[in-house]
Amino acid sequence: MKVRASVKKICRNCKIVKRSGVVRVICIEPKHKQRQG
């Protein structure tokens, strides 16, 4: 899980999701998981 100021899609499998006010990227590739913070 990477914590970043700006979350971006890295590949076409990445999806941007907002969960309880936190922007996250979920992907089948574990390295692509990100959270805004």
Swiss-Prot record:
Pfam family, one: Ribosomal_L36
Signal peptide range in chain numbering: none
UniProt GO cellular component terms: cytoplasm; ribonucleoprotein complex; ribosome
GO molecular function: structural constituent of ribosome
Annotated GO biological process: translation
Ribonucleoprotein among keywords: yes
Keywords in alphabetical order: Ribonucleoprotein, Ribosomal protein
Statement: the UniProt record of this protein carries the keyword Endoplasmic reticulum: no
HAMAP family: Ribosomal_bL36 (MF_00251)
PANTHER family found in the cross-reference section: 50S RIBOSOMAL PROTEIN L36, CHLOROPLASTIC, LARGE RIBOSOMAL SUBUNIT PROTEIN BL36C
Family from the record: Belongs to the bacterial ribosomal protein bL36 family.
Protein name, per record: Large ribosomal subunit protein bL36
Organism field: Shewanella frigidimarina (strain NCIMB 400)
Lineage: Bacteria, Pseudomonadati, Pseudomonadota, Gammaproteobacteria, Alteromonadales
Gene, per the UniProt record: rpmJ
